[in-house]
Amino acid sequence: MARKSLIQREKKRQKLEQKYYWIRQSLKKEISKVPSLREQWKIHGKLQSSPRNSAPIRLHRRCFLTGRPRANYRDFGLSGHILREMVHACLLPGATRSSW
């Protein structure tokens, strides 16, 4: 189980990313449309003035049951060992067990 503070930090980042998503997208479009380099720098400065945690690259995918940040499967939103336990318990329809 991940620490609660890390999970809350990740939720805070998700909220910031959603809040600034359209602002960042519009600034990026402006940068691509402006031909002069000085204007691009000014717009880039505006983009940099937004909070760091509003950038989508800073988001980290976590297991929604345990909060584990590694070995996550996008299709299920679960970490590897939780996914394996659920498949062995027949809780995921359509998934087959594998043992080696």
UniProtKB/Swiss-Prot annotation:
One Gene Ontology cellular component annotation held by this UniProt entry: small ribosomal subunit
Keyword Transcription regulation in record: no
Keyword annotations of the record: Chloroplast, Plastid, Ribonucleoprotein, Ribosomal protein, RNA-binding, rRNA-binding
Signal peptide: none
Record-linked SUPFAM superfamilies: Glucocorticoid receptor-like (DNA-binding domain)
Compartments it resides in: Plastid, Chloroplast
Family per similarity comment: Belongs to the universal ribosomal protein uS14 family.
Function: Binds 16S rRNA, required for the assembly of 30S particles.
Subunit structure and binding partners: Part of the 30S ribosomal subunit.
Protein name per its UniProtKB record: Small ribosomal subunit protein uS14c
Species of provenance: Phalaenopsis aphrodite subsp. formosana (Moth orchid)
Record gene name: rps14
